[in-house]
Structures are given as structure tokens and as C-alpha cells.
């Protein structure tokens, strides 16, 4: 590890403020640049070049503090005088000032980084651990990640350098992984994701985000998915560094906006985060029609259909048996009936959960409900032993109470069965109604009607008045629009909320603007026509 330069004056004040130019927030640098943005740009350029050179270096024999400082020194040797020096050790600049920062805390964080000698002690533990565990070599990828995450979080907390900790630390662990026969590709991690994962550990002790991060940058398949997405973003000139970007976790369900697909993966925008999934996990027929801007549950029309239609149709797939069962289970009345069964089961059988499996079966197959109700009524003990005891001439109070409630339990099961059947019917009916609504296509108005809508307002009613066909087409158009749009889509249209309308319909925002403009103009023309008709009728009535 490099040693700090000797102080030129014994009376020199040691201060963390000496790291920056007076009256600025810009770190003293070899370029002599005091403008912060200009400095950051120059520093970023130089460290990017240095990073390339460092990746071409041979891997070290030992991964320790000395190598960590070497990386920092090589990254920032053209930028800082103190490149490679630890922040808690006083460093004297060429201008004679001496700086040290034994205490350091990121703005907005509750906890500070390691203080003073804690830095050296922590680095010694890092060296010892890596030496004892042979630089984490000979481990599976999962085992390596588990060990590396612990060290990574520890080094995060030490924050040994005044600046450049992240870049130094990431390259250190990339090479540590490489030497162990694994890979950690930190270039695929956005600044925001790294910050979120680091804060979760430092502030809340939550390891999950960091574990997810290491899984994504070490698993070859997930690395391919992230590389493809990042490459696409770069080619389109989009900077996603301020967004969390992560591969979908196994077992997790994501609901969001579909952003597009590449050869390997597809992207969902979930509350501002990009979730990358494997396209093999999507049905082919769904993948072929999905377009950026759609909700993942929506089916987008083909581009050529948009040219012929004002509002495209959607194909809503039938509900699966499992989906119906899940929706039935969430029905309020079904819930009430189920609660009643549980209460009576406690009395009759001594446990609320005795019939849980039967309840699930009834939800899946209602025909089994009446069978169970009859079985409970006739031979309740064949389902489960009754509560209490029956000792020849003596029955406990619990047994007497259980027998008295058998009929009620049988009735409750029958009621539950009826509730399930009714819920299934309603769910199916509502879904079919939604299918019917979505499959309606609203054609583009004829050129004649488009021309009429484009006329100055004072000429529209005159043109409409001499053309019964245009009147009929206008009425038909608005009837189809009202039938096609949901209440939320109608509201978005009225409020000129093009983004919401576009997302709901699975169209571009430009198409949503066209729909809004056409429909609102058509409604205005029809409203004026109706007002004019009513006014004319009143005039005739008064004249007669």
C-alpha cells in the first residue's frame, strides 16, 4: 500500500476540506480544472481509458489491500495526486496543504462509513479472509457469490478512498471472480440499481437486492439478457443509468408495460424499473403481436391494421381453469360462505381447517360440493372424527354440540357450492362481455366524414344537414366508440390523457392523439346537431 507523503510543515492543519479547491465542491486535480462538470467529464474519460488498460493486465497472485490500492492508483493517477492513498491517512498536496477524511457519510444516509482506524482494521480482515479462503477459488458460482457478497458489502462500508471507491471496488471483484473461474460483469449494473442495493444493505441490513444483483451479473444466461438490453438502449441513445435494470427473478410475478423484445429477452417497465425476461417464457403468439407501450396483458394490433382503423380490436384469451378458480376464491360472497364453513367446522370437527382441501376441490370442480354436503349430512364421521367424545352412555358437551351443528355444516357446504357456481357464472359472463367489448374494431371514418370534421365549425352543420348518409355514419361511429371504450378509457379520452389512453388501447401516443381528436370533434358535431334539432323542433312547436 502506498504511504502518505511526509508533511512539509509540522503546523499544517489537517482537514478534509483540503481535498477540494477553496470555495468549491471540486476535488483538487492534476488538470487544474475547478469547474465541477468539466472536471467530472475529464475524469470520467481518463478513468474509462485506464479501466481498459487495467482489464488487460495479468491477474495478481494475491487479492488484497495492496492490489485494491494499485487499481485505484492506476485509475486515478492522471487525476489525483492522492491516487492509491487511503482517506484516513493524512496526505500532503504539492500546494502544501494536508488532507484526511477519517469520517465520511453519504448525503441522505443514516449510517456513516467506517471511521479512522476502522478502515485499516477492516482492510486487514479482508486480506485475511481472502488469504484463508484462497481468493475464493474452487467454489461453485453460487458459493463464490455468497462469499463475495459478504466481502463486497464489507468493503462498501469501509469506503477506504476519498473518491473512486465504486469503480475501484467493482474492478477488484471482477478480477477476483475471473481468477476463481467465474464472472462478475458490473458494467451491466446501472448506477441507480447499485445505489438501491447498497442502501438496502447499509441502511436496512437487507441482502436480497445485492444477492439478486450478483446473480444477474454472474449467471451467463442473465448476462446475455442484460447485454442485449443495454446494447439496444445504447443504440437508441437512451440512458437508463438512473433506472434499476434487472433480470426477472424466478417465481416472481411482474405486472407492467411491455417495452419491446430483442432476440433473447423482452423488457417490462414496472413502476419505473426495467425487468428483463427471457422471451422463451412468453407464448409465441403473444410475442408476435406485442408492441412497446402495451400492457403485458394486452394484445396489440399489427401495424397495418392501425392504418385502417381508428380504434383497433383486441383479442382477450379465455380464462384458464386456474385463473377462474383464483378469481372465484377472491369473490366476496364465496369468502363469506367459506368463513361460515370454517366456523362450523371448528364446532363439528374441532378444527377450522378440516375441510380446506375439500373447499379447494369445490372451487375447482363445483360438482363435488353437493356430494360433500350429502356425505356430511348422512355420515359426518366419514369426513373426519367429530369433536368431543361419545363413551357409550355419555357424550361430552363438545360432541353434543357437534352433532347439533352437522346439518348446519352440510347446509353451509351446499351454500358455498352455490356461491362458487354463481361466482363462476358471473366471472365467465363478465369475461365474455369484456372479450366482446375488446374484439370490436372501430373503423376509420370515411374520407367524407373526415373532411366534414376538418371543416370550420360554421360549415360543419350545413354540410351535415344536406347529407343523411354522413349523419348516419357519424351516429354509427360514436355508438361504436362508446361500445368499444371502457369507462377509464372514456375518462382518459375526455381528459386528453393520451399516455393513459395509448397504454390502455395498446397503441402509440400519436395514435391516441388521433383517436382523441377525431372522437372529440365527432362528439362536438353531433352535440351541436342535436341541439340544433331540438331548437328547430321547439321553434316549429311554437309556430304551430
Curated annotation (Swiss-Prot):
GO terms for molecular function: AMPylase activity; ATP binding. The keyword Endoplasmic reticulum does not apply. GO terms for cellular component: extracellular region. It catalyses: L-tyrosyl-[protein] + ATP = O-(5'-adenylyl)-L-tyrosyl-[protein] + diphosphate; L-threonyl-[protein] + ATP = 3-O-(5'-adenylyl)-L-threonyl-[protein] + diphosphate. Keywords: ATP-binding, Nucleotide-binding, Nucleotidyltransferase, Secreted, Transferase, Virulence. The keyword Magnesium does not apply. ATP binds at residues 93-94, 106-107, 163-167, 170. It is found in: Secreted. Residues 63-216 form the Fido domain. It comes from the Bacteria. Its EC number is 2.7.7.108. GO terms for biological process: protein adenylylation; regulation of cell division; symbiont-mediated suppression of host apoptosis. The fido domain mediates the adenylyltransferase activity. Adenylyltransferase involved in virulence by mediating the addition of adenosine 5'-monophosphate (AMP) to specific residue of host target proteins. This is Protein adenylyltransferase. It comes from Bartonella henselae (strain ATCC 49882 / DSM 28221 / CCUG 30454 / Houston 1) (Rochalimaea henselae).
